[in-house]
Amino acid sequence: MKKVYLLLLTMFLILGTNESMAQSKKYSVYGVGFYNLENLFDTCHDAGKNDYEYLPDGTNKWTGLKYTHKLRNMSRVLSEMGTDKLPKIGCAAIGVSEVENAKCLEDLCNQEPLKARNFQFVHIEGPDQRGVDCALLYNPALFKVRDYKLVPYIYRLPQDSMRATRGFLVVSGTMADEHVTIIVCHLPSRGATSFYREEGGAQIKVVKDSLIADDPNVKLLVMGDMNDDPQDASMAKCLGAKRKIKDVGDGDMYNPWWDVLASGTGTLMYDGAWNLFDQIILSPSLLNRDNSKDYSTLKLFSHQIFRRDYLFQKEGKYKGNTLRTQAGGVWLDGYSDHLPTVVYLIKEQK
């Protein structure tokens, strides 16, 4: 099976536009994505969690039928992510947020589109009061997990001493025979002030700096629902995620989504305007900062917002918005209020 995947991953690309440069080379391409699943809850109460609205007798009347449909819809999207460039293969790894527990992830990975690729998951139960966590789904033929941990989000203000929220899931593994680490996060919502997201950005930077200090060559991706746009202080200042590759210093990161938002599109819509909260941010080790086309090690090749017609409302007041699972107390049998994002990493085959 592994040989089949590696064969399918081979791409023949022409680098450069000059005839003198037009040499066919062999490359392996890997998709890495992120998707906010928007409340993937099962129908059972988790002790100590405020999940009552997602019970059969809760405000959302969350029945087995609705849960089954949610699993089907999420697996469809997840299985299609990355297939624009990697047909029938999709992503090697996908970070997800707003999932209740390991049972939901097990049920999700047992859906046929994901089960066919033997998708596995990494999850650690977190302290969020609603019970929503982050996780990493991965195809073990393309990404091999070494170890993982959950780094807590730390509330520093005295008045927040009793609060707890989602931490930062850090997963280290091997992709293309290289050390790759993925940090999956879901920063505090916009119901809180920007201070808490700025704290989150600064805390991610501490984790990131520690990982790079341990291995300066690690290929590191920070991904998640940041509840902020690329230009906001949590990302641009506190995390140090730059808009242009030429401005990325050794201690910085690169945020390719800044220009995507500036072009007029995003991953979720609010009051008729796009935001781009769902970001995948890359360490300098994944960049060709000298404008070369050196792909002897894993490098960023391209990035995209994953869009399909079925992810959008087709009519009514909210035409053009994402088709949610439910809205205004009405079950829409949709997907999520967010769109997924994908980056493609490329490496020359020797």
Predicted regions and their residues:
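Active-site-proximal beta-strand/loop segments in catalytic clefts of secreted hydrolases
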Residues: 35-38, 97-100, 123-127, 139-140, ...
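Bacterial Sec-dependent N-terminal signal peptides
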Residues: 1-27
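Structured beta-strand-rich core segments of catalytic domains in phosphoester-bond hydrolases
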Residues: 93-95, 99-179
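Beta-strand-turn-beta hairpins that frame and shape the catalytic cleft
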Residues: 24-32, 41, 142-144, 163-186, ...
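Metal-dependent phosphoester-hydrolase catalytic domains
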Residues: 22-24, 209-220, 228-350
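A long, amphipathic alpha-helix that forms part
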Residues: 194-216
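N-terminal, active-site-proximal structural segment of metallo-dependent hydrolase catalytic domains
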Residues: 21-112, 122-134, 202, 308, ...
